[in-house]
Each structure stands twice: as structure tokens, then as C-alpha cells.
Amino acid sequence: VELFLRSGGKLRDHLKPDIDPYTRRVEVDGDLTLREILRVLGIPEGLVAFAFADGKLRRLDYRPGDGDVVTLQPPVSGG
């Protein structure tokens, strides 16, 4: 399965984009959840609050399909 993960901010540093400043192309074997993909990439699950794919809000148990573009959103912080 080939997919594209997008993010900004501190999460982008962990994502290590390679397509453009915000996007990383990822190939995974099998039917993995987003949580499992993050684990394979070494991205701490706590850095992702939620994700968007196909115009819908997705949880980390979402299973991306071939060609999906998934935008990862970090937790909101500030003061």
C-alpha cells in the first residue's frame, strides 16, 4: 500500500517529509492501521491528535487505502 502522510509543526520534524515540505510518501505491507504505520515510522502516537483522509475525520484505527492522502493533526497547545 502506498500512501501520503502530511503534517506541519513539530509533528513534521518526526514525519521527515520527502515529497514537499509537508508530505512523506510511505509504502507499507498489508492492511495496517494508521496507529501501526506511525509505530513503524517511529512517530510517537501522542504527537497525533487526529487525522483527515477522504475529507473525513479519522481515528488512529483507520486503515488507509492505496493512494490515500492522510493529514496528521498534532494536539492543540498554547497559552
Task: Explain the meaning of each model-derived region.
Residues 1-78:
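Ubiquitin-like/PB1-type beta-grasp interaction modules and other compact soluble beta-rich domains
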